[in-house]
Amino acid sequence: MHLAYLDESTKPGPIAIFGAVVVPPGNWGWMERLHGIAIEQLFKIDEIAEKFQEFHAFELFKGEGAFKGIDEDKRYTAIEVLLSAMQGYDFPFIYGAVDEEKLTNSSLAKGLFGMARPLTAAFRLCVLGIEDWARKQHPQRDEAVTVDYKDNYLLIVDDTTDIELKRRLQFTYKVLRAKHPYSNPKPDNNRLWHSHDQMYFGDSVSCLGIQLVDLCTYFMQRHLLKRDKSHRDKADEFFDIFAPNVICAKPEPEWSEYREFIVSHDDNAQARVPQSTHDAKSKGQTA
């Protein structure tokens, strides 16, 4: 089973984004090993238990919090080591992003994606993007969704103290992932055929995958917010490490119906795209 780690970016800005790193079976151990190597770039082994708890993207990049006073070269090397997991083991990074201002000011806000909160809309896009990715790992047929159990995935979301946000995320998941899908009289209600029957929340302190997706989501949002693409900085170099693995979630019908609110890194993102038969839309299913 694939492990899909999800996190939102808390960086202030006009874009609400939820990102996911998918770790295929057999690769988690390599991610943990690289995580350990990254820690060793910053602290002596006998200091780790006392000085290190977790990697926070903003703090690590800016030299704040637990990383205050640590040499920039060491911090940047740690980031490169962490992101090398994306490059070396070909982990996909899937994200959903929406324009907060456009969505908030729109008269369609309440009906859009079935919710009004931009971050919840970004989560919906991201989760559907993971489903689209899972379906594309094996052949599909036009008449129905073909499910391959080797491409099942488990969603592990960074836990939050925002009770209302957590409630909305749980509700969104239950709307997308129908209960008892194989015995449901309306199979079209299920849009997450490859998802585990439950979504879990993890503590980032003890969850390495959440720390990795936090890093990717942070640099993804910086990339989306950047206006002058001709001016490059260190953040661009870090983004380039996992850029080949980046997938903008474009589920249908959301992508076509609400394209003006969705933010994408694709060069031709302004163009409306035709509906794919492999997308995580309402459709029948075959195993």
Predicted features and spans:
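Phosphate-ester processing/binding pockets and catalytic centers
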Residues: 1-287
